[in-house]
Swiss-Prot record:
Modified-residue entries (Pyrrolidone carboxylic acid), positions: Q131
Keyword Disulfide bond attributed: yes
Signal sequence range: none
Name by which UniProt lists this protein: Disintegrin metalloproteinase/disintegrin echistatin
Binding site for Zn(2+): H35, H39, H45
Other remarks in the entry: The disintegrin belongs to the short disintegrin subfamily.
GO MF annotations in UniProt: metal ion binding; metalloendopeptidase activity; toxin activity
Propeptide: 109-130, 180-186
Family assignment from sequence similarity: Belongs to the venom metalloproteinase (M12B) family. P-II subfamily. P-IIa sub-subfamily.
Active-site residues annotated for this sequence: E36
């Protein structure tokens, strides 16, 4: 059992549908939801002349359990007419990020639970006044002061220090010989 406004998808007061279904079959609930959303998208109940190639179509007046999982040719035409005649802007226009109600996003389009507070999730750029996001020489979105130890010495090695200009831990230029690809690092 359900109800929805016909062609109400882009009307803030009518973009709604209600479904009450006590079925334990999830597909049946999904079909009922698709049926009501079909009304929101300008689709009427299918008549006898409509065909979806199955036992029953999503917009049939009476759903035939889980077999009603396709929209009919009539429904597809009605949806196309809805788009052409009513030009529903909430469907045809790509919304601005500030117009959507959703989880904030970042570089990978998902904001992780441990999302970085240094970045604005709407722009994926550092927040104003922030210098860095992470690294051994970054704390609370700011570079650590020059001279802060970022890597303790081991053996005959020397401490490495932050330079106050980067989030990375630069290698101490006064270190003894170390090899990388056979060359001496200075």
């Amino acid at each position: 059992i359900g109800i929805a406004y016909n062609r109400g998808m882009c009307d803030p007061k009518k973009s709604v549908g209600t479904v009450m279904d006590h079925s334990t079959e999830h597909l049946s609930v999904a079909v009922a939801m698709a049926h009501e959303m079909g009304h929101n998208l300008g689709m009427d109940h299918d008549g006898n002349q409509c065909n979806c190639g199955g036992a029953g179509c999503v917009m049939s007046e009476e759903l035939i359990e889980s077999r009603s999982y396709k929209f009919s040719d009539c429904s597809k035409n009605q949806y196309q007419n809805y788009l052409t005649i009513y030009k529903p802007q909430c469907i045809l226009n790509q919304p601005l990020r500030t117009d959507t109600v959703s989880t904030p996003v970042s570089g990978n389009e998902l904001l992780q639970n441990s999302a970085n507070p240094c970045y604005d999730p709407l722009t994926c750029h550092p927040r104003e006044g922030e210098q860095c996001e992470s690294g051994p020489c970054c704390r609370n979105c700011k570079f650590l002061k020059e001279g802060t130890i970022c890597k303790r010495a081991r053996g005959d090695d020397m401490d490495d220090y932050c330079n106050g200009k980067t989030c990375d831990c630069p290698r101490n230029p006064h270190k003894g010989p170390a090899t990388a690809k056979g060359s001496v690092l200075m």
